[in-house]
Swiss-Prot record:
Signal peptide: none annotated. One of its GO terms (molecular function) is ATP binding. Pfam families: ATP-synt. The keyword Repeat does not apply. This is ATP synthase gamma chain. The keyword Cell membrane applies.
Length: 292
């Protein structure tokens, strides 16, 4: 009977877990719809900005007064990695994929003689990497789901990046994030953001155009905005990927809990039947002994 009671308690516990994971799946699905809309609506603007930069940048890059955000400062010695993860777990391999890739890139860069610093957008990667790479941490931004606006990103993250770059704290900057493909598919992505990559083929797209003011002046205004677009787009992609991963993980958890309940229920029924059979045998045996 003690075994039956333990099984009954365990069945109840698994059922409760299933209800919790089912609720978490529904919440993640609702957040995913919103995050997907935001990521997809930001893509056309990002592509249009990229095309504009490719029209302006090639000609300006070869001039002496080219903006540093475009051409850099010469030799790259210090590299800043901007790492996007979630603030919370229970989202499958979403966080671990980025963390593993970041750890590998740090080792690779340090082996090549670069000085590395880390900027975290989301707490999970910071919580893991601070144990081994705490001395590399530059800044940590958390609770970004509450601040999913272009204006916030531009004011609080991008301005700091540009300021630190101009002060010489780093020479190059790369973003690492999960690009959203679908609820069940995300692609780890590395993107150079500072100096902003120049498409040399883009030089042909500007033929026949005259810019007023000149390219350098336009770029001084457009480069910070383009950087903000890159950082925000990566955040939007990461946010959608997080909710997609969490919804998928919770869906798997619900299914697994359901399977476990069925197995435990079968085991409970068999144990109960065995206990009843044993009691009947004892009763019959006792009655027979009394007759004797």
């Amino acid at each position: 009977m003690a075994n039956l009671k333990a099984l009954k308690v365990r069945i109840g516990s698994v059922k409760n877990t299933r209800q919790i994971t089912k609720a978490m799946k529904m919440v993640a699905a609702a957040k995913l719809r919103k995050a997907t809309e935001q990521a997809e609506s930001a893509r056309p603007y990002s592509k249009r900005m990229s095309r504009m930069m490719h029209s302006l940048a090639p000609a300006a890059a070869g001039r002496d007064n080219a903006p540093e955000l475009l051409v850099g400062r010469g030799d790259v010695k210090k590299v800043n990695l901007v790492v996007y993860t979630a603030d919370r777990g229970l989202c499958g391999s979403f966080n671990s994929v980025v963390i593993r890739a970041t750890r590998a890139r740090i080792a690779e860069l340090e082996k090549q003689g670069f000085q590395v610093m880390l900027t975290f957008i989301g707490r999970k990667a910071y919580d893991v990497l601070k144990r081994s790479h705490g001395h590399l941490v530059r800044k940590v931004y958390t609770e970004m789901s509450r601040h999913m606006s272009f204006a916030y990103v531009e004011k609080n993250i991008v301005k700091e990046l540009i300021k630190d770059f101009h002060e010489g704290q780093f020479d190059a900057c790369y973003l690492v994030f999960n690009q959203f493909k679908s609820a069940m598919s995300q692609e780890l992505t590395w993107a150079q953001s500072i100096p902003q990559p120049i498409d040399t083929e883009g030089a042909s797209t500007q033929t026949g155009y005259q810019f007023e003011p000149v390219e350098e002046e336009l770029l001084e205004e457009l480069l910070p905005r383009n950087l903000a677009v890159q950082v925000f787009q990566a955040l939007a992609e990461s946010e959608a990927s997080e909710h997609g991963s969490r919804m998928t993980a919770m869906d798997n958890a619900v299914r697994n809990a359901g399977d476990m309940v069925k197995k435990l229920q079968t085991k409970y029924n068999r144990s109960r039947q065995a206990a009843i059979t044993t009691e009947l045998i004892e009763i019959i045996s006792g009655a027979e002994s009394l007759k004797g």
